[in-house]
Amino acid sequence: MGMTMIEKIIAAHTNRDKVKPGDIVNARIDFVLGNDVTTPVAVKEFNKIGIDEVFDQDRIAIVPDHFTPNKDIKSAEQCKFIREFARDKGIHNYFEIGEMGIEHCLLPEKGLALPGEIIIGADSHTCTYGALGAFATGVGSTDMAAAMATGYTWFKVPSTIQFVYNGELKPWVSGKDLILYTIGDIGVDGALYRAMEFTGETIENLSMDNRMTISNMAIEAGGKCGLIAPDEKTFKYLENRAQRDYTPCYSDDDAEYEKVIEYDVSDIEPQVAFPHLPENTRPISEEGDIKIDQAVIGSCTNGRMEDLRIAAGILKEKQVHHDVRCIVIPGTQDIYKQALKEGLIEIFIEAGAAVSTPTCGPCLGGHMGILARGEKAIATTNRNFVGRMGHPESEVYLANPAVAAASAIKGYIAHPEEVL
């Protein structure tokens, strides 16, 4: 019996010929990531270990993206603490304000997440890099500290659920809709501690930006990671980016899966996830014209160039509804610059949107768009838990960038066709 992609990656990092689901292993780590929320705790734990140096100054990234630019004194102190740690330890991939982006948009862009690697990050959406064929997963700050010290961490080898998507997507349906539909089907615990492997002709036809959106939300189904096999699109994306040599891994034809779930995507509409779980999905034809107060376009889920182009295409020569606050957040500085070159930022501003420097900001209820009691937002983010974007009595509806932009214009959750 052959091995799945996740099993092959783990075997290669544990000097084993074969691993199987349930094995407990100590694996070599290729890259370690932290942000301004999780790294301070990791640094404190690292300092307790009693060593002076990190395992590799080139294989750690610290990205202050959650509460930055610093929203208050506490966030400023946290960033100062991790900035000084990075300087003291000679960590080369510390991304300062003005250079940084949302971490899961930034690392692929910088060529720091690569096929066949094991990447851990003290952030749950580290699974984004599965779109590049990496076993990338979120860990706690203590595990981040240990990995910074040793270059290793332990895993229980997960079993794999394969998700096969076939058919042609309808207009205005994207990777965001595929993953929301999937989570709506299997539930927020439907892939608990499983490797989710996304495949099929539909996945092959998706852009890298859309693939990253899908892998990004694997954790919202409980997934340990969200893997997509590297192909020519992957290798093209990594040309002139990759900072290291890499070895892609692929599932064997006779690999054993826990289950295989198949979808015909041809009838899938744009999806909307209702409060207060990403599994509460409905096709947009059934959403019922829900009035909104805010629209957020951005995040590590949908803050990439393709997302901004789609949103700008909807908003061009139109106006945001007078009762709606529309916030657009490019994922990185390079994305911001490219959007400037293409005239997208001007489109957003002329439509009445506020355009922010890269930040996680409103996604986690941090800053730059907090909701008051009773307010409703449509967002291209990844979570809509109680109080996620502000007051516990506010509501967040998840959707793709086209739906978010159309809704900003109409003042209620709307299909893009309503404004075109």
Swiss-Prot record:
Needed cofactors: [4Fe-4S] cluster
Gene3D superfamilies cross-referenced by the UniProt entry: Aconitase, domain 3
Pfam families in the record: Aconitase
Entry similarity comment: Belongs to the aconitase/IPM isomerase family. LeuC type 2 subfamily.
Stated name of the protein: 3-isopropylmalate dehydratase large subunit
Binding site residues for [4Fe-4S] cluster: 300, 360, 363
Entries under InterPro entries matching the protein: Acnase/IPM_dHydase_lsu_aba_1/3, Acoase/IPM_deHydtase_lsu_aba, Aconitase_4Fe-4S_BS, Aconitase_4Fe-4S_dom, HAcnase/IPMdehydase_lsu_prok, Homoacnase/IPMdehydase_lsu, IPM_dehydratase_rel_enz, IPMI_cat
UniProt catalytic activity: (2R,3S)-3-isopropylmalate = (2S)-2-isopropylmalate
Species of provenance: Halothermothrix orenii (strain H 168 / OCM 544 / DSM 9562)
NCBIfam families per record: hacA_fam, IPMI_arch, LEU2, PRK00402.1
SUPFAM superfamilies recorded: Aconitase iron-sulfur domain
GO biological process: L-leucine biosynthetic process
Purpose: Catalyzes the isomerization between 2-isopropylmalate and 3-isopropylmalate, via the formation of 2-isopropylmaleate.
A GO molecular-function annotation: 3-isopropylmalate dehydratase activity
Cofactor note: Binds 1 [4Fe-4S] cluster per subunit.
Assembly and interaction partners: Heterodimer of LeuC and LeuD.
Enzyme class label: lyase
EC number: 4.2.1.33
Pathway: Amino-acid biosynthesis; L-leucine biosynthesis; L-leucine from 3-methyl-2-oxobutanoate: step 2/4
Keyword list, A-Z: 4Fe-4S, Amino-acid biosynthesis, Branched-chain amino acid biosynthesis, Iron, Iron-sulfur, Leucine biosynthesis, Lyase, Metal-binding
Segments passing through the bilayer: none
Superkingdom of origin: Bacteria
